[in-house]
A protein has these predicted regions:
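Short, glycine/small-residue-enriched coil/turn segments at secondary-structure junctions
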Residues: 237-251, 300-323, 335, 352-357
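Short helix/loop capping segments that flank catalytic or ligand/cofactor-binding pockets
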Residues: 255-258, 263-265, 306-308, 318-319, ...
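Cytosolic, membrane-proximal regulatory domains of ion/volume homeostasis and mechanosensation machinery
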Residues: 264-294, 319-360
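Extended, domain-scale alpha-helical bundle/helix-rich regions
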Residues: 76, 80-265
Length: 360
């Protein structure tokens, strides 16, 4: 009997536990999310370590800034002590407060994303921090906290510290063939299945540049594996001589196509209309795109993760604008002014339009 597809597994999840997760970055069954978080909490508890220097800096910022101290405490207080927000029958929250949050971050900073043979999905993949913050993100104080410029400067440092670990040889331990390794029977099968997109039946090593005879298939780190190269002949460019054809920049799934885009719009409201001025950071170039079409896609967790130019041409300007990391729109949380919503369990999906701006 063959391994079930991701969609078949999702279809078998009871409705009350099912969450739509674009790109499979978080499991479709919220029970898997809770189980994973329980494991991280237990691991961090049984093997406590001194806080990473960047987290000591974060703790100092929280405790020496009255505004941030108020918001971080309030966002945990605002999580309802009822299902599905609590994990146990007496209403205890899984992540209790900001010291507990930092303790879990501390564990994450020295661990790479593991493969999961869970029946309902592939585990947390690249969003374990999002999983830890899932509930506080959707509270009114969480909304303010994750928009705060000082908080986001600190979160950037935290994520960069994790990035350094993921680029180190120590992170390659998850590239084994055991049940938590990405080259386990199910892991390598699902990676190849995704890359074959239902049209071919190539093996992983036939699709991607690697050496199966070497340890970890020759990949030196988690980052080396995650940004693996594909064999050129497996992804020919569509109509390279025809300028009317725009290729996908990466192996992404369509999220939204919007036409007749306004120069500026209320991107934070339900429906998440695109706002060119804010998307392009006030750059005068926005004027060229008013009334045009925006195509937004979502990259799958299992897909090929290198980017290619969607059109031919010459890059004349490029820049990076710092923004927010875990901000989600209020209409998807208990902060919804209408009072009709609980905290969104799939914020990384429902906030996709909103996060095209997030550069405050």
């Amino acid at each position: 009997m063959g391994r079930k597809s991701h969609q078949e597994n999702v279809d078998n999840v009871p409705h009350e536990h099912r969450v739509h997760r674009a790109g499979s970055w978080l499991p479709a069954d919220h029970r898997v999310h809770k189980s994973w978080l329980e494991k991280i909490i237990e691991n961090a508890k049984v093997d406590p370590k001194d806080l990473h220097p960047v987290l000591k800096e974060f703790k100092k910022l929280i405790e020496e800034n009255t505004r941030i101290y108020m918001l971080v405490n309030a966002m945990f207080d605002e999580i309802p002590t009822k299902k599905p927000y609590n994990q146990d029958p007496v209403g205890h929250k899984q992540v209790r407060d900001y010291p507990h949050m930092l303790e879990l971050f501390n564990y994450i900073l020295t661990h790479a994303p593991e493969w999961s043979d869970s029946e309902y999905g592939i585990g947390m993949v690249g969003t374990p921090v999002n999983a830890i913050l899932d509930w506080p993100m959707g509270t009114p104080s969480g909304f303010a906290f994750f928009l705060d410029p000082d908080v986001n400067k600190m979160l950037k440092k935290v994520l960069n510290a994790w990035g350094e670990y993921l680029a180190s040889p120590e992170s390659a331990y998850v590239l084994g063939t055991d049940s938590y390794g990405w080259f386990s029977e199910h892991g390598v099968h699902d990676l190849a299945l995704t890359a074959n997109v239902g049209q071919t039946s190539h093996k992983f090593e036939e699709l991607f540049k690697c050496d199966p005879s070497k340890k970890h298939y020759g990949y030196q780190s988690w980052d080396d594996f995650f940004t693996r190269h594909i064999h050129d002949d497996k992804r020919p460019v569509a109509s390279p001589e025809d300028d009317n054809v725009i290729a996908n920049a990466c192996e992404s799934k369509s999220f939204k196509v919007a036409r007749n885009i306004s120069a500026r719009d209320r991107f934070w409201i339900k429906g998440q209309p695109y706002s060119l001025i804010d998307m392009l950071n006030m750059d005068p170039l926005y004027e060229q795109f008013v009334g045009g079409t925006i195509y937004q896609a979502f990259l799958s967790a299992l897909s090929y993760h290198r980017w290619h130019a969607p059109v031919s041409g010459k890059v004349v300007k490029a820049y990076v604008k710092d923004g927010t990391y875990f901000s989600e729109p209020l209409f998807e949380g208990v902060g919804d002014p209408s009072g009709k919503h609980g905290i969104d369990e799939g914020g990384e999906k429902t906030g996709q339009g909103y996060l095209t701006v997030r550069n405050y």
